[in-house]
Amino acid sequence: MPPKKQAQAGGSKKAEQKKKEKIIEDKTFGLKNKKGAKQQKFIKAVTHQVKFGQQNPRQVAQSEAEKKLKKDDKKKELQELNELFKPVVAAQKISKGADPKSVVCAFFKQGQCTKGDKCKFSHDLTLERKCEKRSVYIDARDEELEKDTMDNWDEKKLEEVVNKKHGEAEKKKPKTQIVCKHFLEAIENNKYGWFWVCPGGGDICMYRHALPPGFVLKKDKKKEEKEDEISLEDLIERERSALGPNVTKITLESFLAWKKRKRQEKIDKLEQDIERRKADFKAGKALVISGREVFEFRPELVDDDDEEADDTRYTQGTGGDEVDDSVSVNDIDLSLYIPRDVDETGITVASLERFSTYTSEKDENKLSEASGGRAENGERSDLEEDNEGEGQENGAIDAVPVDENLFTGEDLDELEEELNTLDLEE
């Protein structure tokens, strides 16, 4: 009797995968919905440790890249085999009534058609690109009506046409040249094509499915507007070049004269508008006017308001909590706003030697201050000079009191003993 086969120690791959998922779920219980970076990093580390053990993340990424390369190699091999052995092409089917010569032969595309000129399908690979596109400026229903003449009608068809043309339902139906909104939306959103069906009833839609001549779409308008846009600098340069060379130079006098003329034109226009509105108000034409205009057009209303006002006098009590805020008020001097030319007389430019001498003096001062020798070099800071000046003005210089018994002989002896007994580490 042969010995029994030993069961696999590791078990099946599915069982191992379930165990790993169970361990990951137990260790990350309650942390999956946490959005913190630490929790997400911990979950990622636990998942990697359970799935790949102590394997390096670089090795895992390398193994995945190798698997991907193997898949790509297999795909390339299949493509090469298909090109070499030419797989079987399914029989071609076309819809009833369609012209076979308008369809490219599938076997000819693969290079397997042996019929040649006898093949009922077309062998012209450019035929698909030569197909007529559907025009958005022509309604296909109009063409069908033009081709559908009385020569091809029978008695039943004739009755149907008469009922449609002169029937009561057709008379009640409004005739319109309005373009269908669904048709326009489909064109604007690039959804219009051979298989597009109008949501408003398909071929029964009462509105036209063709654009009128000269109609411009919104997307084309936006493109034209973007092309017409120019920058502010280009606009200024274009306007300047259009003025020509014979122009008046702008000076203070010409600018003030232009400003005065514009201001006077504005005042005249405002007065004309007020006179016109006043005439409309008197004639009863102005229905909407402001309260200010009412009192301007009828000043007598101000006196009427004073007569109807309350004559009661109120005395204002002086409270103890009032604070007297004394604020200095300065009158506006209009002479400050008078434009003037810049007076360039008397303006001088400093020479380069002055700047070089000034910088050298500053560098010397900084050097003496850094070396701590201001007293030796006979230099003093601005602060010392100010303090000295203040002291001389007061008539005496305040001396700093010095304690002469601060360092006696006993203190110095104790200091020397401490220095001698101090252990110095090298």
Curated annotation (Swiss-Prot):
Residues 382-391 have a biased composition (Acidic residues). This is Zinc finger CCCH domain-containing protein 15. InterPro entries: ZC3H15/TMA46_C, Znf_CCCH, Znf_CCCH_sf. Residues 1-30, 53-74, 299-326, 358-411 are annotated as: Disordered. Protects DRG1 from proteolytic degradation. The modification Phosphoserine is found at S231, S351, S360, S381. Its main location: cytoplasm. Pfam families: DFRP_C, zf-CCCH. One of its GO terms (molecular function) is zinc ion binding.
